[in-house]
Swiss-Prot record:
GO biological process: negative regulation of DNA-templated transcription; response to redox state
Family: Belongs to the transcriptional regulatory Rex family.
HAMAP family xrefs: Rex
Primary location recorded for the protein, binned into one broad class: cytoplasm
DNA-binding region: 16-55
Localization annotation: Cytoplasm
Protein source organism: Bacillus cereus (strain ZK / E33L)
Name this polypeptide is given: Redox-sensing transcriptional repressor Rex
UniProt keyword annotations, A-Z: Cytoplasm, DNA-binding, NAD, Repressor, Transcription, Transcription regulation
Function: Modulates transcription in response to changes in cellular NADH/NAD(+) redox state.
Classification via InterPro entries: CoA-bd, NAD(P)-bd_dom_sf, Rex_DNA-bd_C_dom, Tscrpt_rep_Rex, WH-like_DNA-bd_sf, WH_DNA-bd_sf
Binding site for NAD(+): 90-95
Complexes and interactors: Homodimer.
The UniProt record lists the keyword Nuclease: no
Amino acid sequence: MEQQKIPQATAKRLPLYYRFIQNLSLSGKQRVSSAELSEAVKVDSATIRRDFSYFGALGKKGYGYNVNYLLSFFRETLDQDDITRVALIGVGNLGTAFLHYNFTKNNNTKIEMAFDVSEEKVGTEIGGIPVYHLDELEERLSSDIQVAILTVPATVAQSVADRLAETNVHGILNFTPARLNVSENIRIHHIDLAVELQTLVYFLKNYPQ
């Protein structure tokens, strides 16, 4: 993505827009309004127009947005022509699910290797992805791998993150409950499924539709 000073909330919505625009293009649709986008991605149209305004004139009043132009724009903005190579650390139930999934709908993101300590898993392939011993982490991680998915037990998450900090990894998607401390040059996104579920239940009880 281009280094533009846009709000982080906007940046998080860009892949959502891109996915829907891809589907529109595949269906043969030539143009789309902000209202149609709003209905599809469940983001209000005013927010969509504001998000798009950070990138200049992407559409025309009374016409909407040209689908092919948007597709090309977001493809370039999100660096979809560059392959993002990913390593996964922790081949438990969640990690195994990731290996089988391997971002099949996102052709530019690929898990290329996994790490674990289980003798039953080390030396095997899961979903076509080789599983190495965690002791080989620094040796195996090449300069091409800049993103890691962390699905290890929370008790070892920080120590693994410390080791990743000594490699070329610049981004960690953390699925453990641990809140990690790393250097400023590494960006971490925390996804705690238990917290997400608790939040959903709270909203269901306190903000009924």
